[in-house]
Amino acid sequence: MLSRTILFSTSFLWVRVANAAFGITTSDDSYVIDAGSANSLKFTVSRSSCDITSINYYGSELQYSGTGSHIGSGLGSADVSAVEDGDYIKVTCDTDTLTQYFVVHNGDSVIHMATYTTEEPSVGELRFIARLNSELLPNEEPFGDVSTTSGGEAIEGSDVFLVDGETRSKFYSSQRFIDDQRHCVAGDAHRVCMILNQYETSSGGPFFRDINSNNGGSYNSLYWYMNSGHVQTEDRRQGLHGPYSMYFSRSGTPSTDIDTSFFANLDIKGYVAADGRGTVSGTASGADSSFKWVVHWYNADAQYWTYTSSDGSFTSPAMKPGDYTMVYYQGEYKVAETSVSVTAGSSTSKDISGFVETGDTIFKIGDWDGTPTGFRNAENQLRMHPSDSRMSSWGPLTYTVGSSELTDFPMAAFKGVNDPVTIKFTATSAQTGAATLRIGTTLSFAGGRPQATINDYEGSAPSAPTNLNSRGVTRGAYRGLGEVYDVNIPSGTIVEGENTITISVISGSSGDEFLAPNFIFDCVELFQ
């Protein structure tokens, strides 16, 4: 003790260390968990509701005082227990259909969490929300104030705002699951990050994105959305979601490489340890090498993904045993699909090959990559509303093959706003035979789909796409089910010389301006 007193010569610093006593303090109303960390972390969990009602880190209260941090919108009531087991503390909150876990390791300023479900919450989404002190933690990372809505005026629903002349929304904080291992809120002296190691029981696949943070003024919200109805493309999965970790630091940004294998020893429902898993290894080939390649595995119970190496080789994350659909993407565009079985304790070898197949191209606008990248306003659409003054004019636009820039073609077509989209091109005599106009889309809203007219020939009206029942382009989303439409053009329709194609939005629904039926372009190609 003498040496510690000499080392920490000021009473202030000595008190910080002396108070770092790992353990649980129990009262009638709550459990206070002390992480025993050098930069002291103590948090309080309600014994009746499972809400986190206090987070004290390095002497500062980071929890918003008005409402707790919790799973969903709060459990309301739960059976809450806490146990200390060696260097670990586990808080368990049980309801009939959900179990929430908070886990602390002695000496670490980290709250590890996991959520076990047997059915989807009645609200149709599953998330953890930390409501944090916006005075001490005003900033959002990595995308900045695009999702800071404090002081704004609502311009669409209750989730898109105008702030100092800029459109903002909590949805603009999103990042693709495959790229989102960490997102944070921060201030001058504190940073809190959500570290995401496991998406296996989430829904939507590698390119799904959802709300990550939102400074709404009273508090700064730090989220992990496990699933939601926000442009959701598949059924929700049940089981163990996580582990996921809330990491507290004074200034530095934490690594995303966090070992949570100790969950195997903590009696966590649904946790599958490494020795109960298998992997898939192989080589992907055939797609355009100018794009990143992704391999994706999924079934009703789990999902996994990985980028391939530059030579196409890949090894999956450790997967639960089972039969999986295996998909190969060029960017976000599916080029191949197969199936594979995974066995615990072994690695399965499985190659996959595929490419984009069309024909002899007359023209192509954009790329078959499953995204609107390069088109007008695509660069801004993730982080602002289509009405934002920083957006370029939506048109209607005319794109002339051979002379226009890609930004002369809109990323989205809105019924009655910027449709029809016009394409002008010059054909040779050899190109006047039968042809196919292929219109790739990434997302539809309100039944919007393309109908094309080639010179005097009107293509057939396609049937309505699957309704995802969610706003998309106005909330920073571009990925849905990726419908592709082919227009079969009879011989003689295309003439030697100048030709005109118009693409209109058709739908039996209606809406105002950017909530009118619409769709987002992936690529438009004319080929024979």
Curated annotation (Swiss-Prot):
EC id: 4.2.2.23
Domain of life: Eukaryota
Compartments in which it is found: Secreted
GO biological process: cell wall organization; pectin catabolic process
Gene3D superfamilies: 2.70.98.10, Carboxypeptidase-like, regulatory domain, Galactose-binding domain-like
One function term, GO molecular function aspect: rhamnogalacturonan endolyase activity
Keywords: Carbohydrate metabolism, Cell wall biogenesis/degradation, Disulfide bond, Lyase, Polysaccharide degradation, Secreted, Signal
Family the UniProt entry places it in: Belongs to the polysaccharide lyase 4 family.
Function: Pectinolytic enzymes consist of four classes of enzymes: pectin lyase, polygalacturonase, pectin methylesterase and rhamnogalacturonase. Degrades the rhamnogalacturonan I (RG-I) backbone of pectin.
Annotated protein name in UniProt: Probable rhamnogalacturonate lyase A
Gene this protein is translated from: rglA
